[in-house]
Amino acid sequence: MNLQPITDLLKALNSGNTTTIQQAEQLYADYKNHQPDQLVNSFIVLIRTSQDELLRSYPPVLLRTLVNGNDSGNILKGLKPETLVTLKTELMFAVREEPKNHIRHSILNVIAILAIQLVPEQKWPEILSFIIESSSSPEENLRESSFYLIGAIIDDSRVAETLAPHFDKFALLVEKGLNDPSAKVQVSALETVSTFIDANPEKAEVFKPLIPAMLNTIQKTIESNLEKEAQKGILTFIIIAQYHSDWFKTNFDMIFKVFFQFLEHQSLEDETKHACLHFFLTFAEFKSSIMKKKLYLEPIVLLLLKWMSSVEDMDLKDWNSLDTEPSDDDDSNVAFEAIEALSHCVSKGLWEFFLQCAPTLLNSGNWKERYTGLMTLSSISEGCEKQIKTNFKLIIQSILPLANDSHPRVRFAFFYCLGSFASYLKREMQDLYKTLIPVSLEHLNDPFPRVTISNCEFLTLFLDEIKPNRVKEFKDQFLGRLSPLLQNENYKIVQHSLNAFSSVVDGIGEEFTQHYSEIMPFLIKILRTQTSVETKTLRGRAIETISLVGLAVGKKVFLNDCIQIIQYVSSLEKFKDDDPQVDFFLRAFTRFAQCLGEDFIPYLKYSMSPLMDAINGKVDSSVENGEDFSDESNNSGSIVMENKAMALEMVSIYAMELKHHLFPYVEQLYKGSIELVDFPFSSLVAIQAVNLIPFLVKISKQHFEAVGGLKDGMKAEFTSRLFLDSYERMAASIKTESEPDTLSAKLKALSDLMDIGGQCEQADRILSLTFEVANESFGTLQELETEYQENIDEEDEDADESPEREIIDDAYNSLAMVLGEVCIQFKEKAVPYIATVLPAMIELIETAPSVEIKTSMICILDDLIENGGQKAFELYPHIIKPMMNCTLPNLDPSLIQSAVFGIGLAAENGKDYFTPFLMESLQLINNVIVSVNSVQEQDDDLIAARDNAISAMGRIITNLPQHLGNNFPQTIALWLSYLPIQDDGEAGSIIKSLCTLIRDFSQQIMTQQYIVKVLEIIAVGLHKKAVNPDDKQIISLALRSQESLVAQSLFQLSAENQAILANFFKN
């Protein structure tokens, strides 16, 4: 074989000369397309025989792309059978004989890619024999290569499925590798275990007995000073902790001793120690019942506190110049994040132990320990929120003296800690405003800017959503202390004090008008003059404050300045997509719109252009391709994505404020946002795009009604087309969505679209699509639920529910909104479709692990009963019993509330269809009322459950009186004895039921026995504004007909109720 042409080709590709490389690439393409067999055979010969390292190393790299099944240049199927046989055979020989490690690994990569395509099709049985033989080779490199190959090929799902019956044989092979005399081979064998777990977690169970040998391997590598190899082994343990934490139950004591010893080892690399810590954190997440034991938790927490206390003792001048605390991956910062992670897994045990350590830390003579105490409180403030609340005032009292600490980094940590509390314990913090605001104000003039900035950040968080009267109480002090900071020569102080100042203005509101003329020129000056790269954020804060001041003082005061600011900003050169100012300016313009209302419409063009730019901003290609990229490009890509999400959110606000005036931009906005509903790099971008879509359809509908003169804007061709396209694309997107929070947003958007579209002309198409989505969503949510349940540590009775629980519940609720909206819009036409998913709904009502899911499913039944007509009533035998089973007094009050409400609706709407369930339902409802009334301390949920039960009883009595027979009088007496109710939500239903009885059964109701109770119920209903005009007429006629009885009974009412009725009679 003449190898010269291929040799010349390879040398040309490596020449470094652009022209030569381009010519060589064209020649290479010709070989691929027209002479693939010659190309492959030549590569094989060079790999096997060339003495030139370059000519041996380059062919495997090119072969990898030539045979890659995912590559468009794949030539595998075009090769002659004999070429393929040669390729397979010679590659295996090459691995055995290649002396250079990097070339051998390139050849192994080619074998792996080839095996991934051929093994599932049973076209390379020899490869398994090759792997097994290589694992017993006297050559260390070949033994290591065998395990590398196992890991590489088993990682493919098709190969894993094909080889699953042989996992037990692989386990024996791995066991052999773990006992190999070579540490390199041992670690390679250990690493394959994680690949088997990834490929098939259930079948991987055969590797569980190897845990002691795996741990022994890691120990040996540490003893042999092979830390990089040890780190690979620890990573495998982390993966096992994620997927199979149960594997460690019997061996955890041994694992803990080994890994904790590594943590304490002073001479080990940080990467090794941090990997061990990562293992403990992962294990705590999935097996908190073990990790929370004092034997394990307390030594780790003590070590972490020690690490945190090792914070760098840097020069205060240098520290003061930093934007944030030092964030290197040193022990101190790693410990801070680790304690935060632990607080979410073992909050109770962590808090109890920290309480023992806290006094020593907070009162230490060493500033680093005081700093550690405060920073630890900050890091656990979210995870231990429940525990902190029970000790909150005591905690604040214990740390308050540290506001005056002699060391500035402790004072910094004090305000940093308060800021964390303000984020996660907002109500508790704001209730202490009389204590905390003066402390903050007193220290706003700290000589160290970092402390002042930390204080300002705390104030900003603390004042968020605070009651305005609490801010107004300190208005003069706030303005007096913050105003000088706005003039500070340190732009960072100005920037953060502006943020706090904005929060103060937001709280003061219209009362800030008297200060408007003082502050607005100053803010405008910052906007116009602070144009350097360093002060971009300051400038952003300035326009943010301007917009918040505008909202506070109102359009009349702000209008002229607002218009001038809009015109000035619009004259500026366009910001780059990744400019941090974009966020501030776009949000400010949205507030301008909120302040000016329709007066903003002439300036809408100025804000829509940058919004569209942000929505369409290009994400760095390295992000899109999932490549490694620099911190700079990472930050740039993040800013672009944040701006996309923010711009989409802002357009939604414009839509709410300006409604049909936004119509000229609908088509362009729709085109930009619909492409982002499946945005793969940021769920927030996808969710905001999804949220915007229904608004755009609604704007179009409003436009054709307000401007086009149509009674129903949905009948406009443009709106109809927009609606159907968005519905179809949203439905298609939902079918492939697997993230619960994004799925929830998409389902809610589908519900909103249906609400806007109503009973559109494409009803059959919409119904068909909706139930395709519903069936798919039930399946997806069940998979997510199963995955969630598998990760719960059932042995930990103290475990808090993870955030995933709420996310899944929200997704079910969004699905319920879709199905409920179907019932509301399509009424009887929807019932046959609902019947197809009814078994899934009933199963969830009966077996779902979450009250919220059960309640969501009952809500669908409520909408079905209320809107489905006779076809829905015919389903009563299937749906009433499950609701009745949810009324047992020992169940969650919110579930009972939804169930009794549904039963009342069923009686009211279905009447005769409800008869078979009548007496049992009444008994169950009465049991609910009696049970709640027996509880001495009733919370809002219990009261709502009881009052809904009382309301349901009234619906049953008034709609099925003839079916109660002899029980009718005593049932009325019982119902009246439970009235009036406290829950405002059911007051209207109670009045409606009472008025029905007054109208139809006056002789039984308007009697000496009940008149006082009737008058009391009416007075309460009037006070709650729950009496509609028709009911008022019924009441008026009834009371006039019994004028003397009413007059005799009024004095038995409270003075308040007498006054209410007197006013009613007067009017």
UniProtKB/Swiss-Prot annotation:
It is found in: Cytoplasm; Nucleus. HEAT repeats lie at residues 3-34, 42-75, 93-120, 125-152, 164-197, 206-243, 251-286, 295-347, 349-381, 385-425, 427-466, 468-508, 510-553, 555-596, 598-658, 661-703, 718-757, 763-826, 832-869, 876-909, 917-960, 969-999, 1008-1040, 1041-1064. The keyword Repeat applies. One of its GO terms (molecular function) is nuclear import signal receptor activity. GO terms for biological process: protein import into nucleus. SMART domains: TOG (SM01349). Its main location: cytoplasm. Keywords: Cytoplasm, Nucleus, Protein transport, Repeat, Transport. One of its GO terms (cellular component) is cytoplasm. SUPFAM superfamilies: ARM repeat. Functions in nuclear protein import as nuclear transport receptor. Serves as receptor for nuclear localization signals (NLS) in cargo substrates. Belongs to the importin beta family. Importin beta-3 subfamily. This is Probable importin-5 homolog. It comes from Dictyostelium discoideum (Social amoeba).
